């Protein structure tokens, strides 16, 4: 930002709505965005540019339980330029990863069941077109099929990866990955139509309060896609947890046992394998050589059956359906 909003300006915003500040904290959220926590009950998001798209994403899930609700939106005028803001309810609790060591296996399994119910409720919302891509759609409002969209997405990924200065052995892995995607694309033929996705659905965005599921945060990446795409990050985090002593298998096993609609898809393991390959390529394209040594071996593992290996461990039928 040209000039970050300071606490005095936060107080100006709160005064506009007769909010008395008793406790105020500043944190950095996703994508480096400045966030303020007010009275342990409200969350203030700010931006130099209009927040229309972000606010629309919160509004379209406003009828759901366990999500932040918009209270006020507006613009703060100042000499350094306007600041757009969104004031939301602050959900209670801490993210699953932060409190993982404090949870019992029974609580982890219950979280899996609760998340399955939450996803079924979320995926009842339908759209008219797919948004293809991870985090930020590479193809927004795509009018074709899910399979056609991914074929176009792979071509965009290939074009980007050709600009990267990859090692020769990495280029060989990338070529194998693109051949793998093309050869396996028939599994994407099955579709139920665009469903509303959180699209960054991993344990750091799930909250627990006193050991129980209390909400889902960070909806900035929300878009429309096939429901099984929502499982992409959960699979990734289970096989590659942020710390070696974090084991998400009990949680994920319970989620699959609850049989949410997003897991009742034919060829589920193969579809999730394609999504994982897309994810690794996308991250390397974005981060360059600094991600190459980490993610190229992961690419190989996915192609060599990483999802099948995980499903066997969880006793999940990878054929889905």
Predicted regions and their residues:
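An alpha-helical support segment within catalytic cores of ATP-dependent transferases
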Residues: 2-17, 75, 108, 113, ...
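Short beta-strand segments
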Residues: 43-47, 71-72, 134, 196-199, ...
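Alpha-helical scaffolds flanking conserved acidic
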Residues: 268-275
């Amino acid at each position: 930002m040209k000039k970050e909003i300071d606490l005095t300006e936060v107080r100006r915003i709160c005064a506009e709505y007769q909010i008395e500040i008793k406790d105020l904290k500043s944190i950095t959220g996703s994508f480096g965005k400045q966030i303020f926590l007010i009275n342990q009950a409200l969350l203030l998001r700010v931006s130099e540019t209009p927040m229309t798209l972000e606010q629309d994403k919160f509004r379209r899930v406003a009828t759901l339980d366990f999500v932040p609700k918009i209270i006020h939106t507006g613009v703060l005028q100042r000499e350094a330029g306007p600041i757009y803001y969104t004031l939301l309810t602050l959900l209670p609790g801490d993210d699953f990863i932060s409190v993982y060591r404090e949870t019992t296996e029974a609580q982890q399994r219950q979280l899996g069941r609760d998340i399955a119910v939450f996803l079924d409720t979320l995926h009842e919302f339908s759209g008219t077109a797919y948004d293809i891509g991870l985090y930020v759609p590479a193809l927004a409002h795509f009018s074709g099929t899910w399979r056609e969209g991914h074929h176009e997405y792979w071509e965009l990924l290939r074009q980007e990866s050709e600009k990267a200065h990859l090692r020769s052995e990495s280029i060989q892995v990338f070529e194998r990955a693109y051949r793998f995607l093309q050869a396996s694309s028939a599994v994407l033929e099955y579709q139920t139509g665009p469903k509303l996705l959180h699209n960054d659905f991993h344990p750091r965005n799930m909250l627990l309060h006193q050991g129980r599921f209390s909400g889902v945060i960070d909806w900035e990446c929300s878009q429309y896609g096939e429901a099984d795409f929502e499982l992409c990050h959960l699979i990734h985090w289970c096989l590659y947890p942020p710390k070696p002593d974090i084991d998400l298998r009990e949680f994920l096993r319970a989620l699959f046992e609850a049989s949410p609609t997003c897991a009742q898809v034919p060829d589920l393991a193969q579809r999730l394998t394609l999504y994982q390959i897309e994810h690794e390529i996308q991250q390397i394209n974005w981060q360059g050589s600094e991600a190459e040594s980490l993610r190229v071996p992961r690419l190989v593992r996915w192609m060599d059956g990483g999802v099948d290996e995980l499903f066997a461990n969880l006793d999940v039928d990878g054929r889905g359906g």
